[in-house]
UniProtKB/Swiss-Prot annotation:
GO terms for biological process: selenocysteine biosynthetic process; seryl-tRNA aminoacylation. It is an enzyme of class 6 (ligase). Its EC number is 6.1.1.11. Gene3D superfamilies: Bira Bifunctional Protein, Domain 2 (3.30.930.10), Serine-tRNA synthetase, tRNA binding domain (1.10.287.40). L-serine binds at residues 229-231, 283, 384. GO terms for cellular component: cytoplasm. This is Serine--tRNA ligase. The gene is serS. It comes from the Bacteria. It is found in: Cytoplasm.
Length: 422
């Protein structure tokens, strides 16, 4: 959430940012409501002063008529205060709702665009494999090697669910331990997080827990949702808290299941493990001072690069365009791995990392005490270490062999206990 005063003083820039992001929000309405709230606050303060003056006057020596007049005035002031307080509460609610729809400001260097095709490639790492055979996609590999059962997943749970089987189970656990050990080396505190969060926490992070376009599974009548990422639970961990500055940055990593409705998702790249309703993910989350957030954002991206370089998976880094940014993100980097099973080979997103500045902290009321003793909103960042399903696609497709087997990346062999599948 943006600061109310910032919107008031920078309304044209805020409106342009909304336009660049292709989002629906009304900055002018927010300013109008802000002005209304300000006027009501002033009115309330004046009435409270009148009430105090009336109370002081009652302490003087008065005739019965004078006292009754002050009593009547006091009652009128009290009624007016109650009326203005009610109007102020409504204005506060309307202002909060209007501002909550306004996205974070985008980084000035973020490419302006509408969708992921407008993202800007900034680097490539690794060598795209050249096969002397027709490479299979992970769906066919999973079927041939008895690793993934989509048919049983659909029968038991519905479409976009699956069973991992046999060596694929060990492969997912190997990816998990590989990622955890890298994050531990970088000073991250590990968590296994709840799979359910309150709606107000999702709202604070920037997810829409309700509505037809919501990507979230809500638990009817509970006021809770299945989490789409550990960003939600790790971000809510310090809600309504004041954190000591000397303890910052706080670097957390959370392992969780992730549940996503994927409403409206379709197309060839939605097949198999790429876009499913449930998967496991290792997520990074950082709380820091505003001065640290840009550097820490680079650090998160470099950790993601380290993870995929260590796996020997070719990838590229893209600077996400304004239209492809989530509402909380100030800037976002995506890592896209090479996936040979896509039409003979294409890039597919495997991680992202976002600097959300103070957008989430304002919504969740997370602050730190600065050197001057003032409580200020801190910055939050998040980044995917490993989304296991997509990482598995990259491993299976890039490491497939001519005989139909899968070679295990060297970094994963100690965790798997085997070096080949098939």
């Amino acid at each position: 959430m943006l600061d109310y005063k910032f919107i008031k003083e920078n309304v044209e820039a805020v409106k342009q940012n909304i336009k660049n992001r292709h989002m629906n929000a009304d900055a002018d309405k927010a300013v109008e409501l802000y002005d209304k709230r300000t006027a009501l606050v002033t009115s309330l303060q004046n009435l409270q002063k009148d009430r105090n003056d009336n109370s002081q006057s009652m302490k003087q020596k008065l005739s019965p008529e004078e006292r009754q007049k002050l009593v009547d005035q006091g009652k009128a002031i009290k009624e007016k205060i109650a009326q203005v307080e009610a109007e102020l509460a409504e204005a506060e609610k309307a202002l909060h709702e209007a501002v909550s729809k306004i996205p974070n400001m985008a980084h000035p260097e973020a490419p302006v665009g509408k969708e992921d095709s407008d993202n800007l490639e900034v680097k490539r790492c690794g060598t795209v494999p050249k096969f002397d055979f027709e490479p299979k996609d992970h769906v066919q590999l999973g079927q041939d090697l008895d690793l993934i059962d989509f048919e049983a997943g659909t029968k038991v749970s519905g479409v976009k669910f699956y069973f991992l089987k046999n060596e694929a189970v060990f492969l997912e656990q190997a990816l998990t331990m590989y990622g955890l050990n890298i994050l531990r080396k970088h000073g991250f505190k590990p968590f296994i997080t709840p799979d359910i969060a309150k709606e107000e926490i999702l709202y604070g992070i920037g997810f829409n827990p309700r509505g037809e376009e919501s990507n979230v599974y809500s638990l009817e009548g509970e006021g809770t949702c299945l989490v789409a990422t550990a960003e939600i639970t790790l971000g809510g961990y310090h809600s309504d808290e004041i954190i000591k500055k000397e303890s910052l940055p706080l670097k957390y990593c959370g392992l969780s299941h992730c549940f996503r409705r994927e409403a409206g998702a379709a197309g060839q790249f939605s097949k198999g493990l790429y876009r499913v309703h449930q998967f496991s993910k290792l997520e990074m989350f950082v709380y820091c001072t505003p001065e640290e957030s840009d550097a820490l954002h680079e650090e998160l991206r470099l950790i993601e690069e380290e993870i995929f370089n260590g796996l020997g998976i070719p990838f590229r880094v893209v600077d996400t365009c304004t239209g492809d940014l989530g509402a909380p993100a100030y800037r976002k980097w995506d890592l896209e791995a090479w996936m040979p099973g896509r039409n003979g080979g294409e890039w597919g997103e495997v991680t992202s990392t976002s600097n959300c500045t103070d957008y989430q902290a304002r919504r969740l009321n997370i602050r730190y005490k600065d050197d001057d003793g003032k409580n200020k909103f801190l910055h939050t960042l998040n980044g995917t270490a490993l989304a296991m399903s997509r990482a598995m696609i990259a491993v299976l497709e890039n490491y497939q062999q001519a005989d139909g087997s899968i070679k295990i990346p060297e970094a994963l062999v100690p965790y798997c206990g085997f070096d080949r599948i098939g």
